[in-house]
Amino acid sequence: DELVGLKRNQLRMYRERLTEIKDIFLNPEPEDGINGAWITSIVFGKSYNLKKLDAIKKLAEMDIPARPFFYPLSSLPAYPMAKVKYEPMNPVAYDISSRGISLPGSAILTEDQIDWICEGIKKLLDARSL
């Protein structure tokens, strides 16, 4: 319960700091349950024309670590024939995977660090809006 509470608090802080940014999506809160918020992820809207690896690289230049959003299993090299079959059946998974990153979420992450990360995301997206 303590760890889930900590992770939910991190998600809340990210959400509060990024709320004014249009066309981004953070972990949704289900109506019939509680989001465990194990990994806080952000999916950039199509208006930014921003791929996840480009976002990770730009954030790394600001000393902000981020990781790729989950890849659809059928896109992995271990399943070379699966993409052709399953990508048309799973367009949403392939779409959001290409535009999503996972944000830092260490148990020792401070509020100041979350502020820094969110400022970096804002700079990244402001630069894309020019």
Describe each PLM feature range.
Residues 1-130:
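PLP-dependent aminotransferase class I/II
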